[in-house]
Amino acid sequence: MHFDRLRRREFITLLGGAVATWPFAARAQSGGVPVVGILHSASPTGVWLTLSGAFRQGLSQAGYSQGRNLTIEERWAEGQYDRLPAMAADLIRRDVALIAALTTPSAQAAKSATTKIPIVFTTIADPVQIGFVSSLSRPGGNLTGVTYLGVEVGPKLLELLHEAVPSAKIMALLINPTNPNADSQSKNLQAAAGRLGLQLHIINASTEGDLVPAFVKAHELQTQALMVAFDAFLTPAPRSSRRSHSDTPFRPSTRPAISLRREVS
């Protein structure tokens, strides 16, 4: 199960256009060109580069283009979430009029860095639960954006995996423990696994170097299927790990697997 890539790109394009209707001039430096910061927790490759381009396209369609009447400052943490606070602070020093945070960790870093600059987030699992907004209908504060309610979707994905492979009773959840949603995702999925009569082993990975040990652990635990939690680092990680470490005992390509994003397949 996954979101359609084209629709997701079209949505980010529309979001960029909507952001462009905000009164940039009032928040920009007096007499200067407004600066928009884009804060990424992922690397500038694949779907993330596509979505960044879609955001720029939306701005362009609304009449704002880089170098003419808008400056775009982009920062990529390349999966190293501990770099995000410094990157957010750097954007603030650039006097950005707005920060677009395309993942939960980047939105968390932006939120911690400022209470005044508007922050627009996307692909946030549960912005209310993690304290980004007061409610979905009345966000309050300086953050707004969209949610895909991933914390609620997760148990349904596990149920679908169970229906697709009913013989698999021991499953692995690959999750990034540094993601702000990690605890709530783990608890919800453990509860769902219990209701389904499944064993769900939580396996952590937050860096490239964690991936092979994670899959080795999944093999040692005799897991029969894999669920990948939604996370900017993990989105391309299983695929790249398969390419680089085909001799790993547990290979994602040989196990049934599910994720919210097709990019892990």
How would you describe each model-predicted region?
Residues M1-S265:
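Short hydrophobic alpha-helices and adjacent helix-cap/hinge residues
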